[in-house]
């Protein structure tokens, strides 16, 4: 099984220990997210040390004020590393508004362009910004992963456009029936699973820091939603990750 979105850099005990613990629990691969230049460098270094770890490079919307020609060039250089499989996470977050919306838009559009130039997948963060996120993505010419899927009202469009929908631990929460219905309905070829650790810990571990191996809890939950065996769904998710990230 694979965790397609993890922030290993901030986990208690260190990233290397987290990878080893996940491997012991049966998790074979992890996509470690670089949400700014420093985190991207750490993700690449971790991928160099562990055969089952892959990296993304990008600038999170919370940090979008950092976007500049220099940062864009640095991310482009990092994206050439053989262990880098995607650009992001990037996108729009109007819930927190840690950066101005204009800065978020510039950084998002710049990273879409980088994904298009490199041929790598684009990992998208969207929170309380559906309309503006979709307006950008409709013009994008790259593979799109809707990280921590938050657009259940737009599932049909996502499917029509061939965007991958990645569900995190919050799909297991009792007050998430819309996400659960989306996870049940999305075609198997567009389904991914992730932890977004250390955030969004799934039931029954909610209230503690999330870890990569807990994607297995989300896997079991979504498999039950879809009426299939967890092992069958794991194979589907791994195959989809291979396709979208070129693993």
What are these regions (language model features)?
Residues 1-247:
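Mid-domain alpha/beta scaffold segments of enzyme catalytic cores
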């Amino acid at each position: 099984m694979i965790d397609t979105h993890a922030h290993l850099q901030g986990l208690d005990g260190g990233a290397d220990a987290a990878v080893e613990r996940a491997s012991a629990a049966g998790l074979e691969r992890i996509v470690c997210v670089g949400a700014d230049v420093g985190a991207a460098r750490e993700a690449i270094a971790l991928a160099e040390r562990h055969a089952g770890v892959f990296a993304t490079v990008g600038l999170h919307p919370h940090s979008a004020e950092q976007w500049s020609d220099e940062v864009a060039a640095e991310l482009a250089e990092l994206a050439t590393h053989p262990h880098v499989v995607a650009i992001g996470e990037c996108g729009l977050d109007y819930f927190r508004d840690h950066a101005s919306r204009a800065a978020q838009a510039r950084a998002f559009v710049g990273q879409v362009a980088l994904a298009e130039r490199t041929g790598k997948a684009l990992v998208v963060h969207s929170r309380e910004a559906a309309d503006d996120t979709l307006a950008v993505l409709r013009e994008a010419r790259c593979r799109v992963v809707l990280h921590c899927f938050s657009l259940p009202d737009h599932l049909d469009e996502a499917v029509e456009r061939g965007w991958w929908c990645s569900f995190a631990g919050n799909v297991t929460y009792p007050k998430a029936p819309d996400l659960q219905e989306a996870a049940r309905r999305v075609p198997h070829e567009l389904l991914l699973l992730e932890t977004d650790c250390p955030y969004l810990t799934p039931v029954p571990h909610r209230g503690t820091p999330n870890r990569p191996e807990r994607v297995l809890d989300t896997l079991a939950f979504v498999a039950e939603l879809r009426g299939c065996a967890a092992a069958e769904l794991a194979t589907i998710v791994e195959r989809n990750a291979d396709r979208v990230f070129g693993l």
